């Protein structure tokens, strides 16, 4: 059996009736011979310019004598503009029909909030305008509902990669597919924090050296 097992899921597992599934996962790990721990992490605390909360189950095999894992990253929060400062800001699908609501919508608020404030029927507008100085809200597969902080348009693929902490050279068959995949993914820098803690605290492995070795192999 692996020395360490890691699983993740949405924050909703900690709310209401869904808590029962969390207990089932923890119990199953124990049945399989592991000591599980539960962590709720925010991607923004892990160096990702995105506020995305995920539940991580991290379990070590019972025969491995190690102390409980300490996992509480406190990275400085990175705003959207800082993360995308050298990205071509002119690209991205424009939203000419949204101009009125985009200009009147405050950062991190939705068009629905604006329509309500104007006394208009809210309709089905749920688009959110990002803030230049704050991390992005949680990005999902439906990125069409998130608009740029400075321009009335959708985020382009390069911006989505930056806000998801994916490398600039991460390619997909099409930009649309790439944006969908990133919206459905746990940010790499977030999982890196978990991997680093496990390697250094439980496996006695220098994560930085391991990461550098892997990068060198990828460039050979």
Model-predicted segments: where are they?
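Class I S-adenosyl-L-methionine
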Residues: 1-129
């Amino acid at each position: 059996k692996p020395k360490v097992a890691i699983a993740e899921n949405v924050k909703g597992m900690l709310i209401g009736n869904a808590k029962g599934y969390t207990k089932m996962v923890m119990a199953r790990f124990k049945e399989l011979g592991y000591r599980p721990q539960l962590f709720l992490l925010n991607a923004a605390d892990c160096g990702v310019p995105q506020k995305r909360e995920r539940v991580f189950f991290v379990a070590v095999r019972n025969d491995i004598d190690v102390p409980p894992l300490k996992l509480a990253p406190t990275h400085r929060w990175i705003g959207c503009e800082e993360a995308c400062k050298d990205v071509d800001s002119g690209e991205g699908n424009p939203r000419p029909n949204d101009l009125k609501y985009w200009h009147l919508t405050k950062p991190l608020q939705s068009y629905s909030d604006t329509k309500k404030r104007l006394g208009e029927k809210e309709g089905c507008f749920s688009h959110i305008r990002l803030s230049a100085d704050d991390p992005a809200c949680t990005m999902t597969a439906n990125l069409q509902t998130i608009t740029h902080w400075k321009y009335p348009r959708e985020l382009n693929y390069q911006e989505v990669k930056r806000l998801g902490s994916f490398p600039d050279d991460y390619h997909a068959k099409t930009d649309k597919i790439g944006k969908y995949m990133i919206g459905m993914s746990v940010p790499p820098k977030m999982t890196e924090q978990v991997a680093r803690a496990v390697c250094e605290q439980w496996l006695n492995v220098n994560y930085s050296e391991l990461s550098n070795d892997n990068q060198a192999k990828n460039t050979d």
